[in-house]
Amino acid sequence: FARLEFKTWLRELQGDTPSPSAGERAGVRGEGADLQPPGAHRTGYETILDWTQLDAWLQKLDAAPLAAFDTETTSLDPMQARLVGLSFAVAPGEAAYLPLAHRYAGVPQQLTFDEALAKLKPWLESPRHAKLGQNLKYDMHVLANHGLRLEGVAHDTMLASYVVESDKSHDMDSMALRHLGIATIKYDEVTGKGAGRIGFDQVDIERAAEYAAEDADITLRLHGALSPRLAEEPRLEALYRDIEMPVM
């Protein structure tokens, strides 16, 4: 996102010396989000460990006008990453994690990897089911590693954030605090740091579910916060819709 041409164009659209009202539209309002009670937003999360649960969530995804989607993997390198699990959200606070490849002593029984992906394939590859994510290009690469093509990509909150407020941080933790007043679970909190860090496939499933479902939930909530901001600025909305999203 550090493209000089894009930054120059964005400054021209926003104006080099914005007035107070333009500055407000560029992101000042998000700084004042009231801090929410820790964990209060996570009460409706599920961990999908049986086929009945998965079928129920497939019905929710099929009916949702827009669903947030995220992957948990073995690597930050999308070309090397292998899928560990997927998370979904269909409404604020209504999210789930589907663990598929956690590996540690005493791990609960997980759904069969290939069979679960086969069930998800029609939704993942459906252009008529609108999906959003945070840095979806990464998730698209991960799915491609497993022979799946993500279709129906409608929105990306990281791209929207960059267009709306190019001078701010665009990681989910920062955005959640800035726009929603929510302190999220950090990756280091579930995997550890330094030499003691473990792979996500070694994270306890219930802890992983809390983290992963939150990712999808926060993505959906951020979309709700950022979309009106884009709508206020037709030129920025056009930049997001016509330039940024199509090149994903």
Give the location of each predicted region.
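Long, highly charged low-complexity segments
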Residues: F1-P18, G30-L86, L100-A105, Q109-W123
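Aromatic-residue hotspot detector
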Residues: F6, L239-Y240
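Glycine-biased, low-complexity coil/linker segments
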Residues: G23-R25, E31
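Active-site-proximal helix-loop-helix substrate-binding element of RNase H-like nuclease domains
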Residues: A40-Y45, A81-E232, R241-E244
